[in-house]
Design a protein with these regions (language model features):
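Amphipathic, oligomerization/interface secondary-structure segments
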Residues: 1-144
Length: 144
């Protein structure tokens, strides 16, 4: 199993995923950064893409058959600007697509579902199986 052979490479990504699904009383930009860092780490370690926009577009296209992601309309520009702003505290006027508050929370929610799909596929689940798992789940982290 690939996931077992790569357990050290997947460990930090798995840890970020686990951290992202733990209940927290308040959402913050750190929660967004944890998810986007895990997605970037996944792509850097297991995919060929090196540019965040390309990473996102590739993953969104790859998992477009997943029901829970079909209507998410993840905006790559919002993800990139938000990541750059919250990681480097750049001037917000230079990152006009930066999200905050409820919008950032919703974006993080969508990205977490994408990350879950990446991990499930990595450990060997096909798209039909991922669809079945997510559609049958009543976990509130997958319901939007």
């Amino acid at each position: 199993h690939k996931w077992y052979n790569d357990k050290e490479n997947i460990a930090p990504i798995r840890a970020h995923l686990i951290d992202s699904i733990k209940h927290k009383p308040v959402f913050s930009s750190i929660d967004f950064l944890i998810v986007i860092q895990a997605i970037e780490g996944f792509c850097t370690r297991f995919r060929k893409e090196t540019n965040l926009t390309t990473m996102l577009e590739t993953l969104i296209s790859e998992f477009s058959v997943i029901d829970k992601l079909k209507n998410d309309n993840i905006n790559s520009r919002q993800v990139v600007d938000s990541r750059n702003y919250y990681s480097h505290f750049m001037n917000k006027s230079k990152k006009p697509y930066t999200l905050e508050g409820w919008e950032l929370y919703n974006l993080t929610f969508k990205l977490r579902k994408l990350l879950i799909c990446c991990i499930l596929n990595f450990i060997g689940f096909g798209y039909d199986e991922i669809n079945r798992l997510l559609n049958q789940s009543n976990n509130n982290l997958l319901q939007k």
